[in-house]
Regions:
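Residues at the C-termini of beta-strands that transition into short coil/loop
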Residues: 50-52, 92, 135, 150
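Short, hinge-like loop/turn segments at secondary-structure boundaries
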Residues: 64-69, 106-107, 148-152
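Short, well-structured N-terminal submotif of metal-dependent ribonuclease cores
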Residues: 1-52, 61-78, 137, 141
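Acidic-residue sensor for enzyme active/binding pockets
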Residues: 55
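Flexible glycine-rich beta->alpha loop in the catalytic core of nucleotide-sugar glycosyltransferases
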Residues: 130, 137, 152
Length: 152
């Protein structure tokens, strides 16, 4: 698994959580496989790509106001403060370069380019991180190390 010195932090393994993992944890009844998998990971290794924060906040922002939105917002806020605790892997120059190279390669191959997943891949590549996602096929051609916590 990936080890990293420097940003996003120290010399340790870095695990980035994709949007679908966070969404599964925000539900009334979080996916038990994801919870069990996450419980086996050192919390200090859990990071969130800044793009995932965007996706989650945007998704909540376009929801109709009501109790479901409030509950999901509270769930996200709890996860951000308790699980992630400020460990946000940002889109910096290196990760933007890696994402741009990947997007150009995909376009040249005629492969559809999903900008958000490409930015997440760039962050993962620049961080030499393991990406926890249900959508492994979105990242396989990028050379990103992935794990599917829904299957563990």
């Amino acid at each position: 698994m990936a080890q990293r010195r420097g940003k996003p932090g120290g010399f340790r393994r870095v695990i980035l959580l994709d949007t679908n993992v966070m969404s599964a944890l925000m539900q009334n009844e979080p996916d038990r496989h994801v919870v069990l998998w996450l419980d086996r990971q050192p919390v200090s290794e859990i990071w969130l790509p800044s793009v995932v924060v965007f996706e989650l906040r945007y998704g909540l922002g376009i929801m109709h106001e009501g109790s479901r939105r409030e509950r999901l917002e509270q769930g996200l806020n709890n996860l951000l403060s308790q699980l992630v605790s400020g460990r946000i892997a940002t889109l910096d120059g290196r990760s933007a370069q890696r994402a741009a190279q990947l997007a150009a390669k995909r376009k040249a191959q005629g492969t559809p380019v999903d900008l958000r997943d490409t930015l997440i891949a760039g962050i993962a590549l620049a961080s030499e991180a393991l990406l926890a996602t249900r959508n492994q096929r979105h990242f396989m051609d990028a050379g990103v190390a992935v794990v599917n916590p829904f299957e563990h």
